[in-house]
Amino acid sequence: MKLAYWMYAGPAHIGTLRIATSFKNVHAIMHAPLGDDYFNVMRSMLERERDFTPVTASVVDRKVLGRGSQDKVVTNIVRKDQEEAPDLIVLTPTCTSSILQEDLQNFVARAQEQSKADVLLADVNHYRYNEFTAADRTLTQIVSYYIEKLAGNLPARSEKPTANILGISTLGFHNHHDCRELKQLLADLGVEVNVVAPEGCSVHDIQKMPSAWFNVVPYRELGRGAAEYLQRQTGQPLIDITPMGILQTARFIRAVQQILNTQGARVEYEEYIRSQTLFVSQAAWFSRSIDCQNLQGKRAVVYGDLTHAAAMTRILAREMGVRVVWAGTFCKYDAEWFKAEVADLCDEVLISDDHAEVGDRIAAAEPAAIFGTQMERHIGKRLNIPCGVISSPIHIQNFPVGYRPFLGYEGTNQIADLVYNSFTLGMEDHLLEVFGGHDTKEVITKTMTAQSDLEWDEAATRELAKIPGFVRSKVKRNTEKFARESGRDKITLEVMYAAKEAAGA
C-alpha cells in the first residue's frame, strides 16, 4: 500500500464493483468505511446512464469495530434482497476493511439462508490485486459459478456461427462504442453475437455461453480468465486479438475464418478485408496521403494500459510511419507480454506506474505528440506538447455521447483523426506565435519534477522564445547538451551562440 495523489489503476474493490454493476439485476454490497464509497459518485458522473448505481455501502463505523460486522452485513444483504429482488448479490470488502480480517464467507453463508438471490463473496486478495486483475478475477468467478450450476448439462452448440464477447464493462475506455462496432463486424462476417458479458448481461445468460462457437476477448485486461475457463470446461476456442488498426483488424478476421472453417463452416473473408481496407475504411487511404506523410519521422511517446498502448504503438510505427521514442504501460503484472508486443516497434520500453517518472521521461524525450491517459494529458499541457487520450484512466470528455469506437474499421478512422489532430503542425504553431495566437505559451526550460541542473537567464529565455516552435525544442536540447559538456551551469546568450557554432549551424 502506498500513498499517492494519482493512481493509474484503482484498488481491487473498484474492479469488483465495475463487474457487478455491469451485469443486469446484480447488486453489490461494499463492506467499507466512509471514504471508500466513492464508486457510486464516480460511476454516476462518468457513465451516461439513467439508472442508479446498484451499490450499497455497509459502513464500518465505531459500533461495528466494537461488536463485529456480521449482523450489519447480513442485515444489509437481506434488506437489499427484499427491496431490489436481484438475481445475484456480490459482497466485497475494501483494502481498509480487509484489515479487520473478518470471516466474510461465513457472513455470506448466513445471508444466503435468508435470501432468494444468490450471494457471492468476491474472491479477491485486496493487497495483491489492482482494479484490472480484480475485475478479471471477479468476472471469472461469476461465470464459473453459473456454469457449474449446470452440473455438466451444457446447452448444445448453435446451428449458425455465434460468438460471446467477454470483457465489455462499465467505466471502460470507449467500451460501449467498441462493443457496437464488434457486433457490426461479426454480423458482416455472418456471426451472431450470443452473449456480451458483463455489460448488460443477466447472470442467467451466462448459462447460454457454452452454445457459442467461440469467445472474443477484445481487451488484454478483462475477460481472458473467463474465456480460458470456458475453453477448459466446454472446449470453446478464444480469439484474444484486439482488432485495433487496419493490420490487427485483418488478423482478427482471419482468426475468425480459421475457427469457423475448423468447426465445419466454409467461409472466405479475404475479399471482405480487401474491400473494407481499400474502400470503406478511410485510414488506409489516409496513411498514403500527403497529410499523413507529413507525420513520417515525427517523434511520439505512447503510454497506457496493455491493450491500448500496445495497439497504438503498432499503429503509429507500422501504419503511419511515426517514430515511437518509447512505449510504456502501468500494468506491471503483465510486463513480459507488453515487452514482447512492442519491443520491435519503439526505441525503449517503460514499465512504471509512477506518474512523476512518466512525466520526466516525456520531458526528456521532447516528443512532437503524446498518446496516453488523462494524466499524460495534464503533463502535455504543462510541457506544451499535444496529447491524444488513448487509454484509461480518463475523465468525462472521454465518455463521448457520439459514436467513437477504437475497434474495427470505423475505429481505424477515429484513430487516424486522433493521431493527425494530436500533432501540432509546424507552420501553424509558428504563425500562432508570430501573430500572438491563443496557443502561445511560455518557454519551458525544466523537467516535470524541476530537477534540471541548468538555469536559463532572462535574455537567453527571450531569445529561445523567438525561435519557431517546431525547432525550439531541438535548439534547447542542443544548447543544454553543449552547456553540460563545457561545464556551464547557467545558459546565457553567449552560451547559446557558442552552442550554435559548435553544432555547425
Swiss-Prot record:
Pathway: Porphyrin-containing compound metabolism; chlorophyll biosynthesis (light-independent). Gene3D superfamilies: 1.20.89.20, Nitrogenase molybdenum iron protein domain (3.40.50.1980), Proto-chlorophyllide reductase 57 kD subunit B (1.10.8.550). Its cofactor is [4Fe-4S] cluster. It comes from the Bacteria. GO terms for biological process: light-independent chlorophyll biosynthetic process; photosynthesis, dark reaction. It is an enzyme of class 1 (oxidoreductase). It catalyses: chlorophyllide a + oxidized 2[4Fe-4S]-[ferredoxin] + 2 ADP + 2 phosphate = protochlorophyllide a + reduced 2[4Fe-4S]-[ferredoxin] + 2 ATP + 2 H2O. Keywords: 4Fe-4S, ATP-binding, Chlorophyll biosynthesis, Iron, Iron-sulfur, Metal-binding, Nucleotide-binding, Oxidoreductase, Photosynthesis. Its EC number is 1.3.7.7. Component of the dark-operative protochlorophyllide reductase (DPOR) that uses Mg-ATP and reduced ferredoxin to reduce ring D of protochlorophyllide (Pchlide) to form chlorophyllide a (Chlide). This reaction is light-independent. The NB-protein (ChlN-ChlB) is the catalytic component of the complex. PANTHER family: LIGHT-INDEPENDENT PROTOCHLOROPHYLLIDE REDUCTASE SUBUNIT B (PTHR33712:SF7). Protochlorophyllide reductase is composed of three subunits; ChlL, ChlN and ChlB. Forms a heterotetramer of two ChlB and two ChlN subunits. This is Light-independent protochlorophyllide reductase subunit B. It comes from Gloeobacter violaceus (strain ATCC 29082 / PCC 7421). The lineage of its organism: Bacteria, Bacillati, Cyanobacteriota, Cyanophyceae, Gloeobacterales.
